[in-house]
């Protein structure tokens, strides 16, 4: 797509910042409504899928589900899981299909309100743009978060999951993976399969079945209405989801992971410096069994809801009683390790699969709550004519998924259309 330079003094109706799934979806709906806009992307379309994911990553949802409504994944079966390269190519192809006005290689440094008149001044690496509306479509994965627990130099390598690529990248030795969501579980499993000794620190999580009675969990959440929940269940706002599309897709079972040789630990709690300033001892909370039990209960709850739905609707789906049977607790659960001497265990690397934080330092407007988070309802912020898109639970549980952000973008585009009408009244 051409990298058209932004000219000083250029004007447009809407500036969309970010050309990932949120920015591309936003562009489609604005284009359908005939609203002039520009999508600014500091790197390439879907850059994070290209360069901030490990080599073997695939989508966590099947191709029939994790896509925009108007384009299927080419060369990917409906029940298969697209590779990260195929996902990036999909977004690029979609941008071409809708003729999205994306400008790659343009970084937004600051957005400020005009003084004494409506609209915003958008400062970029290629000049300034005046716009009536701004959509922040950069999503929640801006700044990798590594808890300040283990000091630099305690082990040979510490890196965030966004920097991890493959087992060969890490020095020889055992690996501690902190975080048991989709990223942490898949990375730990890959490292174990490569022959590494692996420790996995497990916190609160939700582990839905990959498939149950012949249907993917994405289908079950749809027919049970769970994608449409508008607020997370109590205490679940920051609970990670452990699900995997790797190796054709499978349910995450922490007991099975322990059976393969991965040692499970509770949440990483504190670090004590070793005698020589290296190695040291990591301490873990005594919450491993509790965390796994809570994940098990959510898993079984979904199975029970699916069974009830099948019976209520007279569906002819295969029985799967074995899915309800949990295996025996491994020793690492019944007698959990609460301290790990890193040098003694041969740990040379720590992979922090501990999530991300948003970064809106470039968006200098009054659109944040007392905790610095976007203050918005369904993407409409408290700062008139500023919108957020691509955030988890923006309007519903499905908001952070490809198909979910598409529907959120339509709502935002319709809201912009309504605002345009009010602002244009009496201007002629």
Name each region found by the language model.
Residues 2-51, 79-428:
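Flavin (primarily FAD) cofactor-binding/catalytic cores of flavoenzymes
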């Amino acid at each position: 797509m051409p990298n058209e330079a932004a000219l000083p003094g250029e004007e447009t109706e809407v500036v969309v910042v970010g050309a990932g799934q949120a920015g591309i979806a936003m562009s489609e709906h604005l284009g359908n409504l005939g609203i002039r806009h520009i999508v600014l992307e500091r790197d390439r379309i879907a850059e994070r899928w290209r360069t901030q994911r490990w080599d073997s990553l695939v989508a966590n949802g099947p191709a029939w589900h994790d896509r925009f409504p108007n384009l299927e994944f080419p060369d990917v079966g409906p029940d298969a899981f697209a590779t990260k390269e195929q996902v990036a190519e999909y977004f690029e192809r979609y941008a071409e299909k809708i003729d999205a006005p994306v400008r790659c290689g343009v970084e937004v440094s600051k957005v400020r309100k005009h003084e004494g008149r409506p609209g915003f001044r958008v400062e970029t690496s290629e000049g300034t743009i005046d716009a009536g509306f701004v959509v922040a479509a950069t999503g929640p994965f801006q700044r990798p978060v590594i808890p300040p627990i283990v000091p630099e130099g305690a082990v040979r390598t510490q890196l965030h999951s966004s920097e991890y690529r493959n087992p060969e990248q890490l020095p020889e030795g055992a690996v501690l993976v902190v975080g048991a969501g989709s990223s942490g579980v898949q990375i730990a499993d890959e490292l174990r399969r490569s022959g590494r000794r692996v420790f996995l620190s497990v916190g609160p999580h939700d582990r839905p079945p990959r498939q149950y009675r012949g249907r993917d969990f994405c289908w079950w959440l749809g027919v049970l209405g769970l994608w449409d929940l508008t607020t997370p269940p109590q205490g679940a706002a920051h609970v990670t989801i452990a699900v995997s599309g790797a190796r054709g897709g499978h349910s995450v079972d922490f007991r099975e992971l322990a059976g393969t040789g991965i040692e499970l630990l509770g949440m990483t709690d504190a670090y004590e410096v070793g005698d020589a300033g290296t190695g040291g001892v990591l301490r873990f909370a005594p919450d491993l069994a509790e965390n796994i039990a809570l994940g098990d209960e959510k898993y079984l709850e979904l199975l029970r809801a699916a069974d009830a739905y099948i019976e209520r609707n007279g569906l002819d789906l295969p029985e799967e009683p074995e899915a309800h049977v949990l295996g025996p607790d491994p020793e690492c659960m019944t007698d959990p390790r609460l301290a790990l001497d890193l040098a003694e265990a041969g740990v040379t690397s720590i992979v922090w699969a501990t999530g991300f934080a948003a970064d809106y330092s470039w968006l200098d407007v009054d659109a944040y709550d007392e905790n610095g988070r976007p203050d918005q309802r369904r993407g409409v912020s408290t700062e008139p004519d500023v919108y957020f898109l691509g955030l988890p639970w923006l309007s519903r549980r499905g908001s952070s998924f490809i198909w979910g952000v598409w529907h959120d973008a339509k709502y935002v585009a319709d809201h912009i259309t309504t605002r345009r009408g009010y602002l244009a009244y009496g201007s002629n």
